[in-house]
């Protein structure tokens, strides 16, 4: 009986750990590097030098439906209006990382 309880406990711990681990984890530090090299010229500090009202600040992202990694990744991949498409220049992982970085920074009001 004691062995059965031990096996059950180990199985439960293993499943809990496995199920709580995300399928992928974005690298925010890499996202910061990608942002600095590709986005900061127009979006320094979460701003927007081309369209002043479409910033990367949390409120603007929410207002324009861009407050998810998927939405940001789509925009980076495909571009829109004055923003060029980066799909041919950045890898999928880099795009995922920069989206995570933007969301992370917007949650901190771009305060670092």
From Swiss-Prot:
GO terms for molecular function: electron transfer activity; heme binding; iron ion binding. InterPro entries: Cyt_c-like_dom, Cyt_c-like_dom_sf, Cyt_C6, Cyt_C_IC. GO terms for biological process: photosynthesis. Binds 1 heme c group covalently per subunit. SUPFAM superfamilies: Cytochrome c (SSF46626). Heme c binds at residues 39, 42-43, 83. One of its GO terms (cellular component) is plasma membrane-derived thylakoid lumen. Keywords: Electron transport, Heme, Iron, Metal-binding, Photosynthesis, Signal, Thylakoid, Transport. Pfam families: Cytochrome_CBB3 (PF13442). Residues 1-25 form the signal peptide. It is found in: Cellular thylakoid lumen. Its main location: other. The keyword Amino-acid biosynthesis does not apply. It comes from the Bacteria. Monomer. Belongs to the cytochrome c family. PetJ subfamily. NCBIfam families: Cytc6PetJCyano. This is Cytochrome c6. The gene is petJ.
